[in-house]
């Protein structure tokens, strides 16, 4: 019998390198460069299903396959526009076809101009999102005129502008494909930097030709859009890092204060991990490695992980001693790696059941012919030496491994290990979920605007909080985030998650005073906590570790909330705002349950100021407590 010995904890951190559980500025580690200055602005629109019904010629359009319907819809909606089909379309678990297009100009991508079309189960257009550029086009191709700088100048430009620890003296340029090169012979990055020629649509309505320089330096995995003529000018920056028997803290325990470790035998779900957690279809492993994840000790914080230490008991008994009083942390590294491996694999299995499968871009080496791109398990680094008091997750596009770094927290004596706070690990893994779903598996750049980035943090907190609910909890139950690992009863957020406005007063217009993604994420997660309890009060709460489905719909309110929030991620446009994400959740429920929860959803958002009349303006959001007349 195989078994796993694990421990689960609860903390919330970013995931793309997404990190920093407490409100702080988003900066390059140790380099005093504020990446918020270079965030991509909000340009997308979202046409909900209700709005689609007002356009009957499009709403009723059918032209063949779901991809053909979507393609023809874009042609009709955006005539004379040049675009290409992105190769990551799929039909999700809820029956919605997701098709995405990238706008091009003279054969060159406009990297932040996307059109996503959602096709309902009836073969008609359900909704769509659009951030296509509609301004003046360059008269001729810059490639024909060679109207751009050498890509090496762009690499030097980003090194200087962002103070990156990359040395490129003597480096050479190798062609990878049309408009894309790789820099060989550099040092300081974890992989060879690359540069791709592309356009960027600016908030002022102009179009900039840029070199998109990709540099992975560990705590930051950057896409820097450098002006193709003035290579010292940075237009935008995207960071992919947002910021057997197992003896573990069982799933549902937020941290070591909520229970004791148990020995679990074969804890995997064969429906979602048919190869188990310790095999990939080619090899059977006796260490913390398998199809979904590979976990190891990483004390130096480096990128090499294959040969790092990981527990490998000959009898597959991953049973190791741990207590919160043990010190130093390396004395319990076996328990730490095991717990991290366990929690991440359970995340994989639960999210798979809710719709984050191979076609949707999940993290697996072997996709077993089920769609998507493989060879992308999650690299899990326990007690990572590259930082403290944090955790982060890097989410490159489908087909490239995700990377989670769990750090030691020094705010208690002895220090505490993030691997044992399940909330932190669930939060980080959820960054991988949201970045793969929003924008599609091939595009991990769709949660980079300040409000969409905030929702990325909020989703992490929401799923971590939903998982930790206890049988006796009610809507009066409050939860803090990251309390144990931070050694603070207040946790790492501004307020506890609560449906009591006197405990947590956050509303939509609170965002007008906030400019940091974790703070904005707390507002979003607060709204989702209201939604969670509205649905639990209506449908009840399944306290088991997996959902029970009836006709493809979770039968209880907790898992139903997790399901429609996840479906909404895939429906919404690239870089959505709160209003668009709310509408996407409403459309997800309409598709899944025929809008049977419409009023519960509206009342949750309206209570926190995101009602019918709410309007997005990055400088002056307008709140509303109104619900549709049929919900009054």
UniProtKB/Swiss-Prot annotation:
Per the UniProt entry, what are the Gene Ontology biological process annotations, in alphabetical order? proteolysis
**Residues glycosylated per entry:** 284, 591
The effect of pH on activity is described as: Optimum pH is 9.
Q: Where is the active site?
A: 431
The reply to whether Zinc figures as a keyword in the UniProt entry is yes
First and last residue of the signal peptide: 1-19
Q: What is this protein called?
A: Extracellular metalloproteinase 1
Q: Which gene encodes it?
A: MEP1
């Amino acid at each position: 019998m195989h078994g796993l010995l694990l421990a689960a904890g609860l903390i919330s951190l970013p995931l793309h390198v997404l990190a920093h559980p407490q409100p702080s500025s988003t900066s390059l580690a140790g380099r005093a460069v504020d990446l918020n200055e270079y965030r991509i602005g909000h340009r997308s629109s979202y046409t909900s299903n209700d709005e689609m019904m007002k356009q009957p010629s499009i709403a009723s359009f059918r032209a063949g396959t779901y991809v053909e319907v979507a393609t023809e819809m874009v042609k009709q909606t955006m005539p004379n526009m040049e675009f290409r089909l992105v190769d990551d379309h799929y039909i999700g678990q809820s029956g919605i076809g997701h098709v995405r297009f990238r706008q091009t100009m003279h054969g060159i991508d406009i990297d932040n101009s996307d059109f996503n079309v959602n096709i309902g189960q009836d073969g008609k257009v359900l909704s769509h999102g659009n951030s296509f550029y509609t301004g003046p086009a360059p008269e001729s191709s810059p490639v024909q005129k060679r109207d751009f700088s050498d890509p090496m100048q762009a690499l030097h430009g980003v090194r200087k502008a962002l103070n990156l620890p990359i040395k490129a003296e003597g480096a050479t340029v190798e062609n990878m494909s049309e408009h894309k090169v790789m820099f060989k012979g550099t040092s300081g990055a974890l992989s060879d930097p690359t540069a791709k020629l592309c356009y960027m649509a600016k908030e002022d309505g102009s179009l900039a030709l840029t070199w998109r320089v990709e540099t992975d330096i560990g705590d930051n995995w950057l896409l820097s859009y450098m002006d193709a003529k003035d290579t010292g000018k940075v237009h935008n920056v995207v960071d992919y890092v947002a910021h057997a028997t197992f003896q573990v803290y069982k799933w549902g325990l937020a941290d070591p204060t909520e229970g004791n470790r148990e020995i679990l035998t074969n804890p995997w779900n064969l429906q979602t991990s048919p190869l188990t957690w310790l095999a990939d279809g080619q090899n059977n492993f006796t260490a913390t490695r398998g199809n979904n994840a590979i976990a190891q000790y990483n004390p130096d914080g480096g990128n090499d992980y294959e040969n790092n230490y990981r527990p490998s008991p000959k009898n597959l008994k991953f049973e190791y001693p741990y207590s919160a009083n043990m010190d130093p942390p390396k004395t319990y590294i076996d328990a730490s790696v095991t717990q991290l491996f366990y929690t991440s694999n359970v995340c994989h299995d639960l999210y798979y059941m809710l719709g984050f499968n191979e076609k949707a871009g999940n993290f697996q080496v072997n996709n077993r012919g089920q769609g998507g791109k493989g060879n992308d398990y999650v690299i899990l680094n326990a007690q990572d030496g590259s930082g403290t008091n944090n955790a982060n997750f890097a989410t490159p596009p489908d087909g490239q491994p995700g990377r989670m770094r769990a750090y030691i927290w020094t705010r208690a004596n002895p220090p505490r290990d993030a691997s044992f706070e399940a909330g932190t690990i669930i939060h980080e893994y959820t960054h991988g979920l949201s970045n793969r779903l929003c924008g599609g598996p091939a595009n991990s750049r769709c949660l980079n605007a300040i409000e969409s980035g905030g929702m990325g943090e909020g989703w992490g907190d929401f799923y971590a909080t939903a998982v930790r609910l206890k049988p006796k909890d009610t809507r009066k139950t409050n939860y803090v985030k990251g309390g144990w690992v931070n050694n603070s009863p207040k946790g790492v957020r501004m307020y506890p998650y609560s449906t009591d406005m006197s405990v947590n007063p956050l509303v939509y217009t609170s965002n007008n005073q906030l400019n940091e993604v974790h703070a904005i994420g707390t507002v979003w997660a607060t709204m989702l906590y209201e939604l969670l309890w509205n649905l639990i009060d209506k449908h009840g709460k399944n306290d088991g570790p997996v959902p029970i489905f009836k006709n493809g719909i979770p039968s209880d309110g907790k898992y139903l909330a997790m399901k429609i929030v996840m479906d909404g991620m895939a429906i919404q446009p690239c870089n959505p705002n709160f209003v668009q994400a709310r509408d996407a959740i409403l459309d997800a429920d309409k598709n899944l349950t025929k809008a049977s929860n419409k009023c519960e959803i509206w009342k949750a958002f309206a209570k926190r100021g995101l009602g019918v009349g709410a309007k997005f303006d990055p400088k002056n959001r307008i709140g509303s407590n109104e619900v549709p007349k049929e919900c009054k």
